[in-house]
Amino acid sequence: MPIKIPDNLPAKEILTKENIFVMAESRAYSQDIRPLKIVILNLMPIKQTTETQLLRLLGNTPLQVEVSFMYTDTHISKNTSYDHLQTFYQTIDEVKQKKFDGMIITGAPIETLPYDEVDYWNELKQIMEWSKTNVTSTLHICWGAQAGLFYHYGVEKVPLPEKQFGVYPHKINVPNVKLLRGFDDEFYVPHSRHTDINKAQIEAHPDLEILSESEQAGVYIVASKDGKQIFVTGHSEYDACTLQQEYERDRARGLNIQVPENYFPNDDATRKPLLRWRAHSYLLFSNWLNYYVYQETPYDLSR
């Protein structure tokens, strides 16, 4: 089934070329189906790239999904135009009276900053508090996962001696959990971060469960026992070339960056990267939409 997005969203053309089933708003209005209402709080600097990555995954399920975008009004974006934000995005003040079936909170390249030094931290706390009553299930990604774990459960982030950068094998900790239904015993996920989360604090919390982790990359997926809060520390949504672009960007800046692990064949950065996380990324988002959103949300969101 399709994703429903604004007719003139730039990501629409890219997704259509990839044969992702995109339905324009004008056509969707003629169908007598209630789509799942998903709101994406996009904290990434280059918002159009993240839009395309997430819409690609949301559009690969049997469910019709209507996507809205949010941004933080207390932060001035340097990499996304004001016109784009005004055309396609809303603030918490504009959506706070609405309810959504699901929400995605993206990462942001600010994990080394203390939370109270993030210029939109107070607004983000307001959004996360609002989500507890206005969203059926929220999926947090990378820094969004760290921020969510800290806000909701007091789990601290911890600095890493060097950047966790590469594609790593992961295992399933909790057999038969719905979020990982259909996953192989071992699967790969990209990571790109300077901080980790305190595993001991997660294990000590009665409302949290570590669903998946990696010997090299640490905790990967944490979920609340009721499924309303999902925290994913990696970047399953990344394109094949995203880590390569980050590596080349940091090298151009003169940073001491290592070649992403398990990414280029024989760690040779001149060769085409290996894409080996696509199937599991589609499955992760499909399972979340099906088991944690669609099967849990009321038909009438006003209830």
Swiss-Prot record:
It is an enzyme of class 2 (transferase). It is found in: Cytoplasm. Its EC number is 2.3.1.31. Keywords: Acyltransferase, Amino-acid biosynthesis, Cytoplasm, Methionine biosynthesis, Transferase. InterPro entries: Class_I_gatase-like, HST_MetA, MetA_family. The record marks 192 as: Important for substrate specificity. The keyword Amino-acid biosynthesis applies. It catalyses: L-homoserine + acetyl-CoA = O-acetyl-L-homoserine + CoA. GO terms for molecular function: homoserine O-acetyltransferase activity; homoserine O-succinyltransferase activity. The active site is at 142 (acyl-thioester intermediate), 235 (proton acceptor), 237. Pfam families: HTS (PF04204). The record marks 111 as: Important for acyl-CoA specificity. Pathway: Amino-acid biosynthesis; L-methionine biosynthesis via de novo pathway; O-acetyl-L-homoserine from L-homoserine: step 1/1. Belongs to the MetA family. Transfers an acetyl group from acetyl-CoA to L-homoserine, forming acetyl-L-homoserine. This is Homoserine O-acetyltransferase. It comes from Halalkalibacterium halodurans (strain ATCC BAA-125 / DSM 18197 / FERM 7344 / JCM 9153 / C-125) (Bacillus halodurans).
